[in-house]
């Protein structure tokens, strides 16, 4: 089996597992377990902070990791720790007390160190395992397949919730998550690594200081930070919708279904359109689409929420796929490891900030104002990435 097929398989399996122990499902479970909305926001912030800490370390070490495939496969297992704790609470809800809350926070912190490791190395792994000319299409197709699989699982989860006990079904899917992480780790470890030959010039470019000499590293700090603020708010939309009584524990499960549909549709759209429209044009188009639809999510009732959120999610996942691809067009391949650490460090740190400011921002301008703030931040990101990519392309053209 080719590495591209294995890449699609392990990313699909990993994303299915990730779906059922994070995001809307995690938020709903925690609220059902007795966590307050503020505790959920704080937990999300902690998880992002631990990712940031690991990314900070990888800024200096990612280029020195020799066994990228092996370390990546091990990092797949990190979320098993947190999911086991979730499973214990779902199997025996009566045992959930203050000690359980503390256990969730501790294991979440530990698990998200591993998630931070996986986040960075997943961008480095393709350089060691595939032909990078296939990277754009492979990214779109693999993400679409992962979204389709996660959609089917999320749909099954939502349908089962309407017929059986919430905690019973949720505990079953926590078990599925654990199995998915183990299997994805095995598939990743089975990939064949290319022999990487590095000459003296490439070694100099691969020096961790080289990325700090690249002016685009600093210019892109701004859009990476503003995107993090926007996505940080986007990621807790289920909690926001429950807090405003638009959704409840049953209807909130459909948020996850929407996300998986949007993942599939957005990534398939990107995979077949990015060469015709160019990555930067797709990014700008998706940014405008998300900015128009997202602020309306809380204003039109339940049906309006699902409609606007579906559209916003579609464009959000086009953006999520476009940015890693456009980065390969802006940043030299020798600097991609350290740069990705910096990019994800800023992006994830901003997500942590976002979950901390939601409560005071809501007190000042209401939840609709919070969504408008997220929209403005996303717009800044899209416009700046477009401008930098256009500038780099023109610069390369002038050199020729």
Spans of features found by a protein language model:
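C-terminal transmembrane helical hairpin of 12-TM major facilitator-type secondary transporters
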Residues: 280-320
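Intracellular juxtamembrane helix-capping segments at the cytosolic ends
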Residues: 115-130, 318-331
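Juxtamembrane intracellular "pre-TM" segments in multi-pass secondary transporters
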Residues: 1, 194-222
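Loop-to-transmembrane helix entry/capping segments in MFS-fold secondary transporters
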Residues: 37-38, 130-142, 249, 333-343
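Multi-pass alpha-helical transporter architecture, strongest
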Residues: 18, 85-90, 180-192, 367, ...
């Amino acid at each position: 089996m080719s590495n591209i097929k294995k890449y699609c398989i392990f990313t699909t399996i990993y994303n299915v597992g990730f779906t059922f122990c994070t995001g809307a499902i995690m938020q709903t479970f925690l609220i059902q377990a007795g966590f307050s909305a503020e505790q959920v926001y704080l937990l999300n912030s902690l998880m992002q902070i631990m990712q940031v800490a690991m990314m900070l370390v990888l800024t200096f070490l990612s280029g020195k990791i020799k066994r990228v495939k092996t370390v990546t496969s091990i990092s797949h297992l990190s979320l098993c720790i947190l999911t086991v704790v979730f499973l214990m609470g779902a199997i025996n809800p009566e045992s959930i007390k203050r000690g359980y809350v503390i256990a969730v926070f501790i294991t979440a912190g530990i698990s998200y160190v591993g998630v931070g490791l996986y986040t960075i190395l997943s961008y480095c792994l393709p350089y060691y395992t595939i032909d990078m000319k296939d990277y754009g299409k492979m990214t779109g197709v693999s993400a679409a397949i992962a979204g389709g699989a996660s959609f089917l699982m999320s749909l099954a989860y939502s349908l089962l919730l309407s017929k059986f006990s919430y905690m019973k079904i949720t505990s079953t899917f926590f078990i599925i998550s654990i199995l998915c992480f183990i299997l994805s780790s095995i598939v990743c470890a089975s990939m064949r690594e290319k022999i990487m030959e590095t000459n003296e010039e490439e070694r100099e470019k691969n020096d961790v200081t080289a990325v700090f000499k690249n002016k685009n590293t600093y210019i892109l700090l701004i859009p990476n930070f503003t995107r993090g603020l926007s996505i940080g708010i986007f990621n807790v939309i289920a909690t926001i919708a429950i807090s405003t009584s638009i959704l409840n524990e049953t209807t909130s499960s459909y948020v996850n279904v929407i996300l998986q549909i949007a993942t599939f549709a957005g990534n398939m759209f990107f995979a077949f359109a990015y060469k015709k429209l160019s990555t930067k044009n797709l990014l700008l188009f998706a940014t405008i689409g998300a900015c128009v639809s997202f602020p309306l999510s809380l204003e039109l009732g339940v049906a309006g929420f699902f409609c606007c959120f579906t559209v916003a999610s579609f464009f959000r996942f086009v953006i999520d796929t476009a940015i890693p691809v456009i980065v390969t067009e802006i940043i030299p391949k020798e600097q991609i490891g350290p740069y990705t650490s910096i990019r994800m460090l800023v992006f994830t740190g901003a997500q942590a900030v976002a979950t901390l400011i939601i409560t005071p921002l809501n007190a000042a301008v209401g939840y609709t104002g919070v969504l408008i703030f997220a929209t403005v931040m996303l717009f800044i990101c899209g416009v700046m990435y477009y401008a930098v990519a256009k500038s780099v392309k023109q610069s390369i053209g002038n050199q020729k």
